[in-house]
Amino acid sequence: MHQFTSTGKLDFETVIKSLDYLEQVTKETLRLYPPGLTFVTRQAKDDFAYKGTQFKAGTCFMVPLYQIQRDPRFWPEPLQFNPGRFAPENDAELIKAAYMPFGVGPRNCVGKSMAMLKLKLAMAKLVLKYRLELGPSQMGQMDINSRAMVSTPARGPWIIIRHISNRL
């Protein structure tokens, strides 16, 4: 990260064009911990049948984002944190509809690009000045509060933050 800035300040161009791995880390984090656990909903416009089951027009469907984004049919080793899944050379292997932290298709979140920019900018600024470590309660698999509508750690987001004093 420090190779991209000598002043400790990040500009738009750096965040957008130079931090490819940060983009991959952001996408993988959103795959494992989507902000909304079931916010993608759709309503049937017409009656239809799927695998022998009839659905009437107006039926509402909620997409289980958390489960789909961890499904081994779509993601090899789905619980493994692997930012390389989103490397450009792996793009052809991705099943685009299985990744939807901002929804999918023509009705996806209109703020997706802005949210990604803000997430990357915040993470870049954090890692420039701080070292982040998991607290003792967060070692291993992070459990999500199953009653929450948004991704919320079950045992609190305990993080140890250490200022990097010898830099900037």
Language-model regions, residue ranges each:
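Juxtamembrane membrane-interface segments of multi-pass membrane proteins
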Residues: 1-7
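Conserved cytochrome P450 K-helix E-x-x-R motif and the immediately C-terminal K′/meander segment
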Residues: 8-51, 165-167
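Conserved, non-catalytic sequence blocks in retroelement Pol enzymes and Pol-derived host proteins
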Residues: 12-20, 109-113, 149-151
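Conserved cytochrome P450 K-helix/beta-meander segment immediately N-terminal to the heme-binding cysteine loop
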Residues: 16, 33, 49, 63-90
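Hydrophobic, well-ordered secondary-structure elements that form the walls
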Residues: 29, 55-58, 81, 105, ...
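C-terminal helix/juxtamembrane-tail motif
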Residues: 60, 150-168
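Cytochrome P450 heme-thiolate "Cys pocket" and heme-binding signature region
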Residues: 88-119, 143-147
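Cytochrome P450 heme-binding "Cys pocket" and the immediately downstream C-terminal segment
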Residues: 113-150
